[in-house]
Amino acid sequence: MSDNWVVQNLQNALTTWNEKLAEIWTLVTQSPQAFKGGSIWGAMVGIHGAVKAIGLALIVLFFVMGVMKTCGTFADLKRPEVAVKAFVRFALAKAAVTNGLELMNALFSIAQGLVSTIMSAAGFGSPQQAVLPTEIITAVEDCGFFESIPLWAVTLIGGLLITVLSFVMIMTVYGRFFKLYLYTAIAPVAMAAFAGEPTQSIGISFVKSYAAGCLEGAIIVLGCIIFSLFAATPPVVDPNAAAVTMVWSYIGELVFNLLILVGTVKMADRVVREMMGL
């Protein structure tokens, strides 16, 4: 690494970005069971099991509410088609609450299969790293003391922007994992809503939201692939320009590319909902 402070600051900012990007690549290919050694998943599964008893009790409540809403009188419930429909709904709701964790794991596995297919088709095993061009390093190292003063300001601003964008992006990806854990913990309560026709929209909304959370990983991977293709052709640097101009031009174009990826990652949830109607 160069001994120049300006170069070191930019390289440290790019190192932070590359580390967070590599961490994202690992996170989107990781299952909730393996995340952080599985300790969080174990706690959520324990909560899921405890909440399941509440879900089973709510099935009865939602079922009675549904019967009272759809059947005007007790005589209506005696009709075979109505009774069979109510029984099937009750049985399916109980199955959803009892086997909800397995159903959610199956949905997540399908989404992870999609992520793996996208990565294999694109031929990417890891994201492309952002590297400071040699021309900029040479130009900055050749600057005198007074010439380097404006470079300090430009470097501080650029380094701060790159670092902030890195943490915004990684926080969004971690937020996806936390949402999946929250869905896992309270799933029995939401699944119990399928027992009643008036409340089934709660269960449908829950399943759609969980599916959208799973599919966010595919959108994030696509964003990383797009950024990697951008990073494969680094910003063009004019070797005849002043050092401060070269650095400012490089940082400006790099931050624009970073904003594309950060924006894609942050909008992954909305993009999935708009594309899939979830």
Task: Specify the residue positions occupied by each region the protein language model found.
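Alpha-helical transmembrane segments
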Residues: 191-208, 240, 271-275
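Hydrophobic alpha-helical transmembrane segments
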Residues: 53-65, 157, 161-163, 180
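Hydrophobic transmembrane alpha-helix segments characteristic of membrane transport
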Residues: 58-94, 186-200
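Alpha-helical transmembrane segments and their helix-start/interface "positive-inside/aromatic belt" motifs
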Residues: 1-10, 80-102, 203-214
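Non-cytosolic segments of integral membrane proteins
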Residues: 93-186, 224-277
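Juxtamembrane "helix exit" motif at the C-terminal ends of alpha-helical transmembrane segments
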Residues: 63-72, 220-236
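Binding/recognition "hotspot" determinant
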Residues: 1-58
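Alpha-helical membrane-interface segments at transmembrane helix boundaries
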Residues: 44-52, 84-88, 92, 141, ...
